[in-house]
Amino acid sequence: MAADGVDERSPLLSASHSGNVTPTAPPYLQESSPRAELPPPYTAIASPGTSGIPVINCRVCQSLINLDGKLHQHVVKCTVCNEATPIKTPPTGKKYVRCPCNCLLICKDTSRRIGCPRPNCRRIINLGPIMLISEEQPAQPALPVQPEGTRVVCGHCGNTFLWMELRFNTLAKCPHCKKISSVGSALPRRRCCAYVTIGMICIFIGVGLTVGTQDFSRRFHATYVSWAIAYLLGLICLIRACYWGAIRVSYPEHGFA
């Protein structure tokens, strides 16, 4: 049952009730446009063998779904294909969207992108002007929308995610593995070289102070503080250089204007 507190990226039917049925569309295929789900009418229809029992057609396989005792729910599950079909309008400010893998999602009216949570789908769906589908009309795809970001392949887990920065050489956090990587290799290379240079300069300064102020330091012990500061700055810069030299790099798949 859809509610305001439900995560917009999660399917409306939990995995515990969905059985072992997998989506009909394989992952990472050419993305089809999503379609808006308008709840069909659920007036009582006399189905064969029953009288006056409310039923509805599944929006995926067109099988009849018995609504007896379920009219208080927002969505119902088909017993044939185990996919969700809405029977009520979504909560205020929300809308239904069906992924090409047939997973029914709920998101905000103003959302422009939504991710399918199914492990073997993980599509990033770009939402554009939605065509409302009536029960009498066949499902029609919505108009495709030009993405404004870049598809990036994570350097840690290899999954693809949408990066909204229009420039490369930035740090990105993968929504799948939650790890940080650099989009492009120019940024870590520049920073690694810069930190190595600064670190070596600080160490050379520390060595020069150590050699040049040995006699002076025997009388003024505060000179040791300047040695320590120079060596410490050099060590910190070299550690940062190691970090930037070892950071994983994520590469863009496609660029969009």
From Swiss-Prot:
Residues 1-10 have a biased composition (Basic and acidic residues). Residues 13-23 have a biased composition (Polar residues). It is found in: Late endosome membrane; Lysosome membrane; Cytoplasmic vesicle, Phagosome membrane; Cell membrane. The active site is at C107. The chain crosses the membrane at residues 192-212, 227-247. The modification Phosphoserine is found at S33. The modification Phosphothreonine is found at T22. Keywords: Cell membrane, Cytoplasmic vesicle, Endosome, Hydrolase, Lipid metabolism, Lysosome, Membrane, Phosphoprotein, Transmembrane, Transmembrane helix. A motif (CX5R motif) lies at residues 107-113. It catalyses: a 1,2-diacyl-sn-glycero-3-phospho-(1D-myo-inositol-4,5-bisphosphate) + H2O = a 1,2-diacyl-sn-glycero-3-phospho-(1D-myo-inositol-5-phosphate) + phosphate. Residues 1-43 are annotated as: Disordered. Its EC number is 3.1.3.78. GO terms for molecular function: phosphatidylinositol-4,5-bisphosphate 4-phosphatase activity. It holds the Pfam family Tmemb_55A. GO terms for biological process: negative regulation of phagocytosis; phosphatidylinositol dephosphorylation. GO terms for cellular component: late endosome membrane; lysosomal membrane; phagocytic vesicle membrane; plasma membrane. It is an enzyme of class 3 (hydrolase). It is a multi-pass membrane protein. Catalyzes the hydrolysis of phosphatidylinositol-4,5-bisphosphate (PtdIns-4,5-P2) to phosphatidylinositol-4-phosphate (PtdIns-4-P). Does not hydrolyze phosphatidylinositol 3,4,5-trisphosphate, phosphatidylinositol 3,4-bisphosphate, inositol 3,5-bisphosphate, inositol 3,4-bisphosphate, phosphatidylinositol 5-monophosphate, phosphatidylinositol 4-monophosphate and phosphatidylinositol 3-monophosphate. Negatively regulates the phagocytosis of large particles by reducing phagosomal phosphatidylinositol 4,5-bisphosphate accumulation during cup formation. This is Type 2 phosphatidylinositol 4,5-bisphosphate 4-phosphatase. It comes from Rattus norvegicus (Rat). The gene is Pip4p2.
